[in-house]
Amino acid sequence: MAHKKAGGSSRNGRDSAGRRLGVKKFGGETVIPGNIILRQRGTKWWPGDNVGMGKDHTLFATVEGNVSFKKGFKGRTFVSVLPVAEAAE
């Protein structure tokens, strides 16, 4: 008798949603304290002046100012926030 074995189900067909990583505020943009500057896995970018780093390596502003990206020590890119000058009284 000619029988055909039952076909197995495919093991493909799944994918995970994108994690929405990357730069959220680019160089020169104005930020306020708490604004997320970028999301990353690991330390592709390092926190510079007036920037904090969360436990998931997210960089965020700690003061109001403009975002700045600079190359530094060991080829690392540092993200800083340059405070806006206070209005003269």
From Swiss-Prot:
Gene3D superfamilies: 2.40.50.100. GO terms for molecular function: structural constituent of ribosome. The keyword Cell division does not apply. The keyword Ribosomal protein applies. Belongs to the bacterial ribosomal protein bL27 family. HAMAP family: Ribosomal_bL27. This is Large ribosomal subunit protein bL27.
